[in-house]
UniProtKB/Swiss-Prot annotation:
Name of the coding gene: ddl
Cellular component terms (Gene Ontology): cytoplasm
Chain sites annotated for binding ATP: 130-185
SUPFAM superfamilies in UniProt: Glutathione synthetase ATP-binding domain-like (SSF56059), PreATP-grasp domain (SSF52440)
Cofactor: Mg(2+); Mn(2+)
Protein name (record): D-alanine--D-alanine ligase
Catalytic activity: 2 D-alanine + ATP = D-alanyl-D-alanine + ADP + phosphate + H(+)
Biological pathway: Cell wall biogenesis; peptidoglycan biosynthesis
Molecular-function annotations in GO: ATP binding; D-alanine-D-alanine ligase activity; metal ion binding
Residues reported to bind Mg(2+) 1: D254, E267
Subcellular location: Cytoplasm
Binding positions for Mg(2+) 2 per the UniProt entry: E267, N269
EC number: 6.3.2.4
Protein task: Cell wall formation.
């Protein structure tokens, strides 16, 4: 097949996206496909239409963060009739917005830590938040990934610094109760829950950007140290979160598990990283899958879905851009 890989983009996760894109490009080429990489810009709709006219069969999205993981590109590809891997526009948009996700989790009975919204019309103080959520607490921008803009705060000074950091990347911020315990992540491929991974940062208890992407920044424990009953609760909560948002293909659910082994869903990532230090490839490896085999399964899953729905197959679409050259 002729495959276009979208990598780079303009979000704060651009560099991670490039690493993901290069790894997926190699895997797709190893599978015998002809692969072209495009770095999205404002001309992306026209470029994709041109690629479709030139015989593009599939688009592999290797973007992370706003502009790639939030449903914008997915909606564009649906309109053009080009199949792609992963979740559709709605699930992508819901998962990208952590506040909306948490509201859906709460409505669906999925345990998620308590939170409060901070904005200019509701400028909560440290005392307000600590009284409601306890200390420490977590400050998060609503719509960024890779822990960009996230901080754990323990006093008024770090609270002010955390707000400044979060506001530098997003206008929508919330404060979340910190759950002590273990960091667990679940990779889910079309409803199949892969082996859970317990994340142990090399320094401290915070799985930040450096811990995620720097070699040696964290240790991935497979199998995790949860009891069978605790693991079952964790898997059930993760799968329910995946389904509540309407996810498809590969997604990763991040959770905290408290000392009583109660799971608390933090967020769902619909385009999880596929770098040498990423979690999903490690979970797949625990099943004996190579990186290339994981990519092949994701590709076949997407193609099967496109054939079943007819909504993401280039031959079935009459989408045009008027008289575009």
């Amino acid at each position: 097949m002729n495959i276009v890989v979208l990598a780079g983009g303009r979000s704060a996760e651009r560099q991670v996206s490039w690493v993901t894109g290069k790894a997926c490009k190699r895997a797709l080429e190893d599978l015998g496909h002809r692969v072209k990489v495009i770095d999205p810009d404002e001309d992306l709709p026209l470029r994709l239409w041109q690629e479709r006219q030139a015989g593009c069969d599939f688009v592999w999205i290797a973007l992370h963060g706003p502009g790639g993981e939030d449903g914008v590109v997915q909606g564009m590809l649906d309109w053009l009739g080009l199949p792609y891997q992963g979740s559709g526009p709605l699930a992508s948009a819901l998962a990208m917005d952590k506040l909306v996700s948490k509201q859906i989790f709460r409505a669906a009975g999925i345990p998620t830590p308590d939170w409060q919204v901070w904005d200019d019309q509701n400028p909560l103080t440290w005392a307000d938040c600590a009284a409601e959520l306890g200390s420490p607490l977590v400050i998060k921008p609503s719509n960024n990934g890779s822990t960009v803009g996230i901080s754990i705060v323990r006093d008024e000074r770090s609270f002010a610094q955390g707000l400044e950091l979060a506001r530098s990347v997003s206008s929508r911020i919330f404060l979340e109760r910190y759950v002590p315990g273990k960091e667990i992540t679940l990779s889910i491929l079309s409803g199949q829950v892969l082996p859970a991974i317990e994340i142990i940062p090399a320094q401290g208890d915070f799985y930040d950007y450096e811990a995620k992407y720097a070699p040696g920044g964290s240790r991935h424990l497979i199998p995790c140290s949860l009891s069978p009953a605790g693991l079952a609760r964790c898997e059930a909560a993760g799968l329910k979160a995946y389904q509540a948002l309407g996810c498809e293909g590969l997604a990763r659910v991040d959770l905290r598990v408290d000392p009583e082994e109660n799971p608390w869903v933090l967020e769902v990532n619909t385009l999880p990283g596929m770098t040498p230090t990423s979690l999903c490839p490690d979970a797949a490896a625990a099943l004996g899958w190579t990186f290339t085999e994981l990519v092949e399964r994701m590709l076949q899953d997407a193609l099967q879905k496109a054939q079943l729905t007819g909504s993401r197959h280039p031959q079935s679409s009459s989408a045009t851009l008027g008289n575009a050259p």
